[in-house]
Amino acid sequence: MRGCVRNWGRGLLPLLLVLLAAPLGAQVTPEEHAERRNALAERVGEGLVLAVGSVEPPQDYIPFFQNSPFRYLTGFVEPNAMLLMEVRDGAIAAEVLFVNPRDPATETWEGYRIGPDGVLEVTGIPGRSVEELGEAFDALVSEHGEIAVVGAYNPGALIQNDVTQRVAALLEGHSEVSVTNVTREVADLRAVKSDAELELLRRSTAITTQAHREVMGALAPGKNEFEVQAVVEYTFRRYGSERPAFASIVGSGPNSTVLHYKTNDRFMEDGDVVVVDIGSSYGGYSADVTRTLPVNGRFTEAQSEIYQIVLDAQGRAEEIARPGVSVAQMDQMAARVVAEGLAEVGLIESVDATYETAEGQRIPQFRLFYMHAMGHGIGLDVHDPWPGVLEPGVAFTIEPGIYVRPNLFEEIIPDVPANQGLREAIRPAFERYVNIGVRIEDDYIVTEDGLEWISPAPREIEEIEEAMARPWDGPEERNEDWVEWFRRME
């Protein structure tokens, strides 16, 4: 089933050896950021480009994260920055990065700022104070008469976001200037990753995979979901991950059927499964790996049946994934396997059967239990841009799932004449599988001839049960080599 997938072995050591073999590749250089800006300039052709960075949070105890399009173009991660580029004949004629000025009083509270004089060395872009942006913008925009914005610019929105407000302030007195949004063009550039980006994704995913291994040892009936979250996020930080890439999901029992459950405060019970959907961010690049585990270390027969359907669906998508294959093809293949499995266990009437919604629409019955897409791109964002057709350098997830929600009959399947046969037919299976939610998610890189699996945490039923049977006395000892990855990024 998974013959086309090249992986790095089942254990931690093979993965670690591959990562350490390329220590210099795990950073995106100023030269690469310049190539990205040049590629955008080719697409814009002529005029001004204004890339808008994220603003500083209103309180200094709220973490700041740079928005992904701006980080992609500049690598600059301080707040309030803006990049102004003048493009002529598809090339950058001039560019300036406007940043917060040095301010020793503010830096006493918030930390060191690079400042305009330090920007060139760090980013390769000439720097000026953001306080000078208005004057520079006024001089150039009058000449060009139009501007291309990179950022969430949406002047028609009811509530104006920070990007729109900052652009609107610059445009005061320039009503004749036309504005286009070229964030989509930046997203297209982000869809295929460079070698440096792929190395960062491998490392982020390796840390995430290690967190899953720790969780498999830590799980036990009576523990709370937040204890699992603590193990996960401790593992992330101790190996240099700056933060979780998204809110960690640890959903047990009925919570396993909630796709993006975030409360993480239920005491897990003997006989539960728990969905652990986690991802570290390393060097700005996000992993996203999910495992579904038996809390007591052994899957029940019913849990195994649902789990195997999901695993087979993932395997089918893996099997066909290679350059030239469309995302839609993989999605259809995975969905077909899920539908066939659900029909076999009695949760739907047949593979192609439908049900009637409250609005009178006919929807495939398998969507009662599998209501999301097969996967998504990964990169600077955990849901990163990716193309409709696979090509080498694309990084993405495959994550089918089945969720047997406890409110299926009361709130999900309308009690109307058209659905009576369905409701009667699937009730016995529902009672067997209720409160079982299963999602299996892995991360991949498309190669010239197939697929590289970069998240090899145990996922076969036997592998998981074997991993959970091993004694666990707490997190593994500090791995100095892994911590050294971070030093090489400085």
Region spans (language model):
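Bacterial N-terminal signal peptides
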Residues: 11-23
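Bacterial N-terminal signal peptides that target proteins for export
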Residues: 1-13
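Active-site neighborhoods and metal-handling regions in enzymes and metal-associated proteins
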Residues: 24-490
